[in-house]
């Protein structure tokens, strides 16, 4: 059976206000750690005037690249709770930045954990989350007489055959050297 996983197809943005502090969660699908880091830098530039730009990302089939940052918030109050949301939702290949504009009222550690978690949940709710299936891409080249054999092999793989997409290009005619003038 082919493995399925959840990922973000289209990113989104969610926002909450907690005791006058504004939390903006921006979520984006990523395929590599480099894409995740570029997205984080993009958000830091966009929200350069914010007090904090905390982030989380999880990339890879086995979450090979998973990181989070509190960006100056008390240790464990922003990045880790955001990571817990991603892990709890079982979403792969995703990056998120939660930007905080401080409203003048301290939230305490529990308040920060709840605010960062809730804002990321809002960001995910505004995103399009889909289920994908791990698979392979392959190209098979054959002459016309081999097409039936290839189709037969794919049908024997059932029920996985529903995951195969085929494309056939049939050319007719013959090749001949170009006439020289």
What are these regions (language model features)?
Residues 74-91:
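Positively charged, aromatic-enriched nucleic acid-contacting surfaces
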Residues 1-77, 181:
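C-terminal regulatory domains involved in ligand/effector binding and gene-expression control
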Residues 173-180:
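Terminal, non-globular segments
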Residues 117-135:
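Long, charge-dense
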Residues 109-113:
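Conserved structured catalytic cores and adjacent interaction surfaces
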Residues 141-160, 179:
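Short amphipathic alpha-helix segments
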Residues 129-144, 171:
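Short glycine-/aliphatic-rich beta-strand segments at the starts of folded cytosolic domains
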Residues 92-102:
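Glycine- and acidic-rich phosphate- and metal-coordinating loops
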